[in-house]
UniProtKB/Swiss-Prot annotation:
Species annotation: Mus musculus (Mouse)
Positions annotated with a glycan in the UniProt record: N7, N18
Membrane topology category: Single-pass membrane protein
InterPro entries in UniProt: Reprimo_fam
Protein name per UniProt: Protein reprimo
Chain segments annotated as coiled-coil in the UniProt record: none
Amino acid sequence: MNSVLGNQTDVAGLFLVNSSEALERAVRCCTQASVVTDDGFAEGGPDERSLYIMRVVQIAVMCVLSLTVVFGIFFLGCNLLIKSEGMINFLVKDRRPSKEVEAVVVGPY
């Protein structure tokens, strides 16, 4: 019985070693550099033109987002400025002149 148990652990150890080696072989086999097309030529990563197009699209998207943020902040600031001017005008209309102001205004007449 001990010999059977010992054999099972040895087999399990060999399986683990072989599985890690098999995994390494599979990873090395399936890299992007080793992909072969129908013509038989190995195709590398993305070509230079597609990288250029991706970069231009990224720059365009970042410009649009930046302009959106800048104009959003600008219009928010303008809106707050208009509201604050309206509040100031509202407060000025509700203020009552003091008695000293009336005395000064009435005095020269």
